[in-house]
């Protein structure tokens, strides 16, 4: 009875990553482990098949050999198929991808070429802070390669199909004898693809894909920030000859905002207040992304004081909690004063000068420190 394909056994694709293979093995090993199957012989056999498949596909050299020669790579007396040389055994020890370097020069077995998936693509999108925080649906146009419809991605003319390469027997490589050594080379007939198309599709010229600008709908989740990526699986370039498509990554960049600066979940802004409000206290309006809110400013507030508005920040895409809005008050100096207004300020200054320590403790403390500094220099 012929063995099952190792990739099929582990339920993964031929271009599966090492991580995907390990994950699949753990899942199946747990499912079919003898301790869990209560003596079921068929499941015990499946467990052995899974273990054998993992031992091969988890080893880079053994996997490469399997991809090249199939199960024949690990069978005693297994033969490579055509490709130059005199034919001989390749089944002794396949720890080395080249097999027994002094063995026969027949290349190949029943392996097959792994399809080369299409390239991944990146699309840059720029968002306002409001759109990044609330989320948005976009339509984007992406120049790419898509599968050719007339030939369904095969590259062959409708009604025909690609044939297995007679030179390399579908392996994509041949072995050439150079003295005592057998050297692997890309098959010159099929250029390493393992198949040959006699009647090429006229739409894609045998490539199985054509250039096209795709229109895609993208849902930007709420809370994204600059540097975040959204993956659209299978929306990258289509691979040649029906190979899987790559992925499309939408790269987010958030424009600078006129009022707010974002730091993770928190927002920061500066709010100007008048000299009178800072001195006597009062209520001011503060902008948030959801509209204006009232903020009470206590009397004798100094410039630079920070007020926290809880829950008025951002709910990040990576977090369930909402950040805060940090408002820094900046006291504005009056400008364009009339003569009467200037006189009033001078009168105020004169009245406060007699008790400056009481009204301007920081200023008084500063000048006292300066005086002490120069007194110390003189002594």
Swiss-Prot record:
<protein>
    <recommendedName>
        <fullName>Chaperone protein DnaJ</fullName>
    </recommendedName>
</protein>
<comment type="subunit">
    <text>Homodimer.</text>
</comment>
<dbReference type="InterPro" id="IPR036410">
    <property type="entry name" value="HSP_DnaJ_Cys-rich_dom_sf"/>
</dbReference>
<keyword id="KW-0143">Chaperone</keyword>
<comment type="similarity">
    <text>Belongs to the DnaJ family.</text>
</comment>
<dbReference type="Pfam" id="PF00684">
    <property type="entry name" value="DnaJ_CXXCXGXG"/>
</dbReference>
<feature type="repeat" description="CXXCXGXG motif">
    <location>
        <begin position="148"/>
        <end position="155"/>
    </location>
</feature>
<dbReference type="InterPro" id="IPR036869">
    <property type="entry name" value="J_dom_sf"/>
</dbReference>
<dbReference type="InterPro" id="IPR012724">
    <property type="entry name" value="DnaJ"/>
</dbReference>
<feature type="binding site">
    <location>
        <position position="148"/>
    </location>
    <ligand>
        <name>Zn(2+) 1</name>
    </ligand>
</feature>
<dbReference type="InterPro" id="IPR018253">
    <property type="entry name" value="DnaJ_domain_CS"/>
</dbReference>
<feature type="repeat" description="CXXCXGXG motif">
    <location>
        <begin position="165"/>
        <end position="172"/>
    </location>
</feature>
<dbReference type="Pfam" id="PF01556">
    <property type="entry name" value="DnaJ_C"/>
</dbReference>
<feature type="zinc finger region" description="CR-type">
    <location>
        <begin position="135"/>
        <end position="213"/>
    </location>
</feature>
<feature type="binding site">
    <location>
        <position position="165"/>
    </location>
    <ligand>
        <name>Zn(2+) 2</name>
    </ligand>
</feature>
<comment type="function">
    <text>Participates actively in the response to hyperosmotic and heat shock by preventing the aggregation of stress-denatured proteins and by disaggregating proteins, also in an autonomous, DnaK-independent fashion. Unfolded proteins bind initially to DnaJ; upon interaction with the DnaJ-bound protein, DnaK hydrolyzes its bound ATP, resulting in the formation of a stable complex. GrpE releases ADP from DnaK; ATP binding to DnaK triggers the release of the substrate protein, thus completing the reaction cycle.</text>
</comment>
<dbReference type="InterPro" id="IPR001623">
    <property type="entry name" value="DnaJ_domain"/>
</dbReference>
<dbReference type="Pfam" id="PF00226">
    <property type="entry name" value="DnaJ"/>
</dbReference>
<dbReference type="GO" id="GO:0009408">
    <property type="term" value="P:response to heat"/>
</dbReference>
<dbReference type="GO" id="GO:0051082">
    <property type="term" value="F:unfolded protein binding"/>
</dbReference>
<dbReference type="GO" id="GO:0042026">
    <property type="term" value="P:protein refolding"/>
</dbReference>
<dbReference type="GO" id="GO:0005524">
    <property type="term" value="F:ATP binding"/>
</dbReference>
<feature type="binding site">
    <location>
        <position position="190"/>
    </location>
    <ligand>
        <name>Zn(2+) 2</name>
    </ligand>
</feature>
<dbReference type="GO" id="GO:0051085">
    <property type="term" value="P:chaperone cofactor-dependent protein refolding"/>
</dbReference>
<keyword id="KW-0963">Cytoplasm</keyword>
<keyword id="KW-0479">Metal-binding</keyword>
<dbReference type="GO" id="GO:0005737">
    <property type="term" value="C:cytoplasm"/>
</dbReference>
<feature type="binding site">
    <location>
        <position position="151"/>
    </location>
    <ligand>
        <name>Zn(2+) 1</name>
    </ligand>
</feature>
<keyword id="KW-0346">Stress response</keyword>
<dbReference type="GO" id="GO:0006260">
    <property type="term" value="P:DNA replication"/>
</dbReference>
<feature type="binding site">
    <location>
        <position position="201"/>
    </location>
    <ligand>
        <name>Zn(2+) 1</name>
    </ligand>
</feature>
<feature type="binding site">
    <location>
        <position position="187"/>
    </location>
    <ligand>
        <name>Zn(2+) 2</name>
    </ligand>
</feature>
<feature type="repeat" description="CXXCXGXG motif">
    <location>
        <begin position="201"/>
        <end position="208"/>
    </location>
</feature>
<dbReference type="InterPro" id="IPR002939">
    <property type="entry name" value="DnaJ_C"/>
</dbReference>
<dbReference type="GO" id="GO:0031072">
    <property type="term" value="F:heat shock protein binding"/>
</dbReference>
<feature type="domain" description="J">
    <location>
        <begin position="5"/>
        <end position="70"/>
    </location>
</feature>
<keyword id="KW-0677">Repeat</keyword>
<keyword id="KW-0863">Zinc-finger</keyword>
<feature type="repeat" description="CXXCXGXG motif">
    <location>
        <begin position="187"/>
        <end position="194"/>
    </location>
</feature>
<feature type="binding site">
    <location>
        <position position="204"/>
    </location>
    <ligand>
        <name>Zn(2+) 1</name>
    </ligand>
</feature>
<keyword id="KW-0235">DNA replication</keyword>
<dbReference type="GO" id="GO:0008270">
    <property type="term" value="F:zinc ion binding"/>
</dbReference>
């Amino acid at each position: 009875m012929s063995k099952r394909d190792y990739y099929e056994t582990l339920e993964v694709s031929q271009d599966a990553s090492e991580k995907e293979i390990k994950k699949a093995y753990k899942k199946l090993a747990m499912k079919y482990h003898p301790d869990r199957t209560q003596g079921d012989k068929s499941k015990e056999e499946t467990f052995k098949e899974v273990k054998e498949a993992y031992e091969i596909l988890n080893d880079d050299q053994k996997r490469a050999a399997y991809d090249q020669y199939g199960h024949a790579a690990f069978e005693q007396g297994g033969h490579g198929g055509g490709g130059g040389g005199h034919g001989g055994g390749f089944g002794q020890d396949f720890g080395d991808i080249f097999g027994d370097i002094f063995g026969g020069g027949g290349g190949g077995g029943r392996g097959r070429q792994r399809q080369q998936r299409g390239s991944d693509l990146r699309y840059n999108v720029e968002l306002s802070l409001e759109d990044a925080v609330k989320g948005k649906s976009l339509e984007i146009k992406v120049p790419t390669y898509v599968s050719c419809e007339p030939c369904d991605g095969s590259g062959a003319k409708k009604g025909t199909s690609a044939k297995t390469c007679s030179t390399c027997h579908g392996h994509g490589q041949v072995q050439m004898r150079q003295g005592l050594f057998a050297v692997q080379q890309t098959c010159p007939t099929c250029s390493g693809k393992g198949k040959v198309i006699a009647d090429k599709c006229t739409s894609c010229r045998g490539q199985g894909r054509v250039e096209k600008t795709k229109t895609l709908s993208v849902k930007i989740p709420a809370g994204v920030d600059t540097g975040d990526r959204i993956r659209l699986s299978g929306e990258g370039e289509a691979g040649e000859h029906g190979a899987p498509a790559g992925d499309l990554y939408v790269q987010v960049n958030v424009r600078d905002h006129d009022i707010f600066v974002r730091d993770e979940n928190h927002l920061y802004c500066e709010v100007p207040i008048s000299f009178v409000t800072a001195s006597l206290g009062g209520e001011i309006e503060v902008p948030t992304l959801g509209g204006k809110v009232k903020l009470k400013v206590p009397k004798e507030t100094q410039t630079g004081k920070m007020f926290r508005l809880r829950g008025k920040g951002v709910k990040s895409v990576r977090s369930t909690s909402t950040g805060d809005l940090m408002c820094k008050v900046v006291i504005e100096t009056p400008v364009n004063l009339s003569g009467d207004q200037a006189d009033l300020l001078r009168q105020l200054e004169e009245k406060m000068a007699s008790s400056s320590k009481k009204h301007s403790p920081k200023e008084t403390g500063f000048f006292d420190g300066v005086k002490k500094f120069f007194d110390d220099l003189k002594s």
